[in-house]
Each structure stands twice: as structure tokens, then as C-alpha cells.
């Protein structure tokens, strides 16, 4: 009897430790091919995943968005993997030393990139919105959102039920767009872009 009680006591003492071990156990499931974080809701949750950052910078520089042709996917990939940028707002604060770390970019090319970046600061609202890479928001949907809501500032205050009233936006997408504006990294990007001089009010 005494031995049984001892075993039960030992098992009870182990329970809290087992709970802690389970809490810190690495989650299972498919992993991001770039940063090997476990995929959640069909997306990599890692905010500084180089693949996610590369895709965002590439979208930002595309002709349908901010039109910075000198910054293509190879350059965006290097910027992301070197940890020089987390979002497009940080592109505009890179130092000459940062750019010097990007292979394959000559001094003349860098001058052209910086000219293109300066020209990019007065985009159409829909092009700016498309460049922000909201989930499910294509170039056409960006135009529709601006037509319906009015400005990026207004979009930040829009509730999911209002998004659902727009043709082509279902409940899931409405929530994702709403949630995008409340993400800490996205809010940081918007704040930095606003400080640079991008217009979110028109």
C-alpha cells in the first residue's frame, strides 16, 4: 500500500513538469521552406521570415505598386536574408553601407534605384495599397477598396462587416484585411511610411 501511495505521489509531482514540457514542445506540421517555422493557417507566422519579406518587397517594387524596377527579386532577397529590411518602410532608410552589402548592384545602378525610390513617394492610393500586400488584395481589389472606402487612413478604421459589403470580399477575407491593420509590424510599416511622406489620407 505504501509503495502504491509513493508511486501516486511521484506521478502527481511529475504532472506540472510534464505540462511545462508539453507547453514548450515544438509544434508539429508542415514547415516554411525558408525559415522552417511551422505553418499556421496556410502561412508562415514568422514576422522576419526572409521569404515573406522578399515577397513583400518584390510586390512593393512591382509596376502595379510603387514601380521601382531597379529593385527586383534578387535584390529584395538579399535585403531580406541580410536582415536589412523587415518591411518596405525600411527601404527608404538604408545607408550607403547597407546598399554596399548587396551584390550585383553597381554605383550607377544604386543611383538609379534611389531616384526611382524618390519618385515612388507620390503613388496613386490604390497602387500604394496594392504595395502593402494585404491578404487577398490584388491590384484590382485595391482599386475597389479605395473607391468604396476612400483612403488608407479610412481603411484602418473600417470594420469587417463593412469590408464584406464590397463585391469580392467574403467573411474570411474581411477579417484578414481587418487583422492586417492591427498587426504590430504592419502598423510599424505604416507609421514609417507616413513619416517618410506617403499620403494615406487621399
Where are these regions (language model features)?
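OB-fold and OB-like beta-barrel modules that bind single-stranded nucleic acids
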Residues: 1-2
Amino acid at each position: 500500500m505504501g509503495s502504491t501511495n509513493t508511486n501516486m505521489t511521484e506521478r502527481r509531482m511529475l504532472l506540472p513538469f510534464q505540462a511545462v514540457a508539453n507547453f514548450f514542445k515544438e509544434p508539429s506540421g508542415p514547415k516554411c521552406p525558408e525559415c522552417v517555422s511551422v505553418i499556421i493557417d496556410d502561412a508562415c507566422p514568422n514576422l522576419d521570415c526572409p521569404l515573406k519579406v522578399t515577397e513583400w518587397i518584390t510586390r512593393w517594387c512591382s509596376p502595379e505598386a510603387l514601380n521601382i524596377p531597379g529593385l527586383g527579386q534578387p535584390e529584395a532577397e538579399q535585403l531580406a536574408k541580410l536582415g536589412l529590411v523587415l518591411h518596405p518602410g525600411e527601404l527608404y532608410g538604408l545607408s550607403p553601407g547597407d546598399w554596399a552589402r548587396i551584390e550585383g548592384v553597381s554605383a550607377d545602378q544604386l543611383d538609379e534605384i534611389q531616384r526611382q525610390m524618390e519618385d515612388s513617394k507620390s503613388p496613386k492610393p490604390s497602387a500604394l495599397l496594392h504595395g502593402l500586400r494585404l491578404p487577398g488584395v490584388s491590384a484590382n481589389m485595391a482599386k475597389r477598396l479605395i473607391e468604396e472606402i476612400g483612403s488608407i487612413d479610412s481603411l484602418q478604421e473600417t470594420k469587417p462587416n463593412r469590408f464584406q459589403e464590397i463585391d469580392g470580399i467574403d467573411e474570411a477575407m474581411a477579417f484578414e484585411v481587418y487583422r492586417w491593420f492591427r498587426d504590430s509590424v504592419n502598423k510599424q510599416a505604416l507609421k514609417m511610411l507616413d513619416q517618410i511622406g506617403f499620403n494615406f489620407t487621399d
